[in-house]
């Protein structure tokens, strides 16, 4: 029984890691209100093959060295990766740099595609 409790606690803490997870619809709403700064964490080639409108590409491996490019700290910073598994780690990096309003696209770009939402 203690192992089950540990697993549950791990899953709960991991689900909140890096920032609050949001739906595609919430991302669209925040973006339409001009209240979001979208960061696509995928590699440049994947970004060029299709990304969410108004997102900028800062690959995860470069994020720690490029936080100075995040100029609009008054907006929600929404992190986007392939499946939503890299974004929590990126959120932790941003929180250590002093960013407070970090959000994560639940399911990443794959979930976005599954909902037939547009990419540019």
Language-model segment annotations:
Residues 1-24, 33-36, 44-76, 85-120:
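Rhodanese-like catalytic fold shared by cysteine-dependent sulfurtransferases
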Residues 27:
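Conserved histidine-centered catalytic loops in small-molecule metabolism enzymes
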